[in-house]
Amino acid sequence: MTQNQPPGAPRARIPGPSQPPLPYPRPHAGLWWRCLAVGLALWALTATVTYATRETALLPTLILLGSFLAPVAFVLWAYQRHGRDLGVHLILGCFLTGGTLGVVGASMTERHLLHPSWGMYVGAGLIEEAAKLAALVFMLHRHPRVRGPRAGLVLGASVGFGFAALESAGYAFNATVSLQGIDLRALLETEILRGVLTPFGHGLWTAVTGAALLACRRPNGRFRPASPVVAAWAGVALLHALWDSTHGIALWLVARLTARGLDRTLFTQGHLPWSTDEQRHLFTLFSVGGLVLVALAGIAWVRSLARRAPAWRNTP
């Protein structure tokens, strides 16, 4: 027995469009600069209170805030702009675990292999860049599908910034402790200087080697030491060595240009003895100019890799 249809034209039920779930979390826009602004305010507050009260219990807070603020902000920027599909856990793991392994491995190797000499900076650059690259390989050996220059840029930068944060904390601690006791002024100067220079050092260099490493990764997930990887490692090690030796190069240039009858054996002290105003101005010019040139070279290298990566323009 059939039932009568209700009067009027039949209406078909068409389900409305539904939004598929996002494959990755979307953080609020501008999270990185908000983190940077709040962190700067907290660091300034901690520094002011510590300087006014001379309370040594605040020193760990001051050191950690100053050392991790800039690296964390730049890793957040990289995650928001180009790395959301890589996952928070992988980027965070590269930052913390990769950075720690890089610092520990580089420190152990440098202690046994490096001795004071003209080639010390080159050796330090080769060792530290190799340690960070090995840390990145360790972090990605269980992620065989992660490949390509974009992923290498983001994850390599995460390892590099983790390395820079821990290294800055070590330098800040060393600057704090002196024969006269706690040197708070040296601590603040060290953190400000390294905080400003952080974006142009380890993060850029490891981003370059990471991009080369993952661009040459095999489809089965195995890494291979191809010639582009070795060339990138040698290139960033050279930038690293130039960055570290800028102070000594500036001293040498000033001596060559202005010194007449100067006892150059006193350069072992790390400064120009009996320097004039002209020499001090030239030294500042060469030191800052050298750092700027090395930073610009690193930025240009990263930008060229980003332009050549086809997936870079398609990231959310």
Regions found by a protein language model. Name each.
Residues M1-P316:
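Hydrophobic alpha-helical segments at protein termini of multi-pass membrane proteins
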